[in-house]
Amino acid sequence: MLETAELYFNVDHGYLEGLVRGCKASLLTQQDYVNLVQCETLEDLKIHLQTTDYGNFLANETNPLTVSKIDTEMRKKLCREFDYFRNHSLEPLSTFLTYMTCSYMIDNIILLMNGALQKKSVKEVLAKCHPLGRFTEMEAVNIAETPSDLFKAVLVETPLAPFFQDCMSENTLDELNIELLRNKLYKSYLEAFYKFCKDHGDVTADVMCPILEFEADRRALIITLNSFGTELSKEDRETLFPTCGRLYPEGLRLLAQAEDFEQMKRVADNYGVYKPLFDAVGGSGGKTLEDVFYEREVQMNVLAFNRQFHYGVFYAYVKLKEQEMRNIVWIAECISQRHRTKINSYIPIL
């Protein structure tokens, strides 16, 4: 017997949940990947993708076909699907989907700011921006010289505005400060998204909170790894860590003091969920920390579909689709560069 909350969920969101589950069922199978890695050219790859849910998404692309064109068209296809979900959603699912776009908006802003710093044309950089993170005021990013300028001129009317409260400063936006800004924005964003899911409760909280806890900890670990050998002080490093993960508070305090990968690994070894991930780094497969994080993310997102009546399936589907796209780009790059020895080093999903 369905509980009242579940009945209301079906009334408001049941159609879209059914739709996204159908989309998940159309992800590439292991047999599809076996066929893709046997392709000799990008044209062969295109022909095989036409037999999958991707269909004729490359029909309008002129020769020569490039990896970049394939990647761009896959992103556009995902964006069209997501826009359909968002355009037909009711609250609070609409807000949840808006939260999902914020990470792409942050990446786009940072991309545009770095482009302005390197004197690249806005048009050139806009072409590289993720379609899920596009917003009207993006082109004005190049006029901002400080975070305060950026907020006043560009972001005040966007969903990112609340995350800027901890980032306001008059520091010139050089390469280091832009990267610090990215991490501060992500920290505020993840903590706000986590609070939204936790406050929502029900199955959405059960599914999304562990996923966002993992994402917060992954960011803390990657920030730590990338800060070794840089000017970033240990105190500043700690201010960039999201506090909604399992590492909070003691693990984050220890990570802030870590001076090399081995010390970082010792911190992770204290947490049952992260020890096996670090143990898997290197070894016969030559996996990187990023590889094992992606594998863990895929596992969590696949499991999200085992539960019903929650918003997490929308998040999980987009993340799984992105991993599928990374896999296709990896295979396409190996084919394009005739570097087939590592063509099977993609991350399986189903």
UniProtKB/Swiss-Prot annotation:
InterPro entries listed in its UniProt record: ATPase_csu/dsu_sf, ATPase_V0-cplx_csu/dsu, ATPase_V0-cplx_dsu, V-type_ATPase_csu/dsu, V-type_ATPase_csu/dsu_dom_3
SUPFAM superfamilies: V-type ATP synthase subunit C
Keywords: Hydrogen ion transport, Ion transport, Transport
A GO CC annotation given for this chain: proton-transporting V-type ATPase, V0 domain
GO molecular-function terms, A-Z: proton-transporting ATPase activity, rotational mechanism
Tissue spec: Predominantly expressed in the kidney. Also expressed in the lung, testis, skeletal muscle and heart. Upr-egulated during osteoclast differentiation and is most abundant in mature osteoclasts.
Subunit architecture: V-ATPase is a heteromultimeric enzyme made up of two complexes: the ATP-hydrolytic V1 complex and the proton translocation V0 complex. The V1 complex consists of three catalytic AB heterodimers that form a heterohexamer, three peripheral stalks each consisting of EG heterodimers, one central rotor including subunits D and F, and the regulatory subunits C and H. The proton translocation complex V0 consists of the proton transport subunit a, a ring of proteolipid subunits c9c'', rotary subunit d, subunits e and f, and the accessory subunits ATP6AP1/Ac45 and ATP6AP2/PRR.
Family in the record: Belongs to the V-ATPase V0D/AC39 subunit family.
Main function: Subunit of the V0 complex of vacuolar(H+)-ATPase (V-ATPase), a multisubunit enzyme composed of a peripheral complex (V1) that hydrolyzes ATP and a membrane integral complex (V0) that translocates protons. V-ATPase is responsible for acidifying and maintaining the pH of intracellular compartments and in some cell types, is targeted to the plasma membrane, where it is responsible for acidifying the extracellular environment. May play a role in coupling of proton transport and ATP hydrolysis. Regulator of osteoclast fusion and bone formation.
Name of the featured protein: V-type proton ATPase subunit d 2
Gene: Atp6v0d2
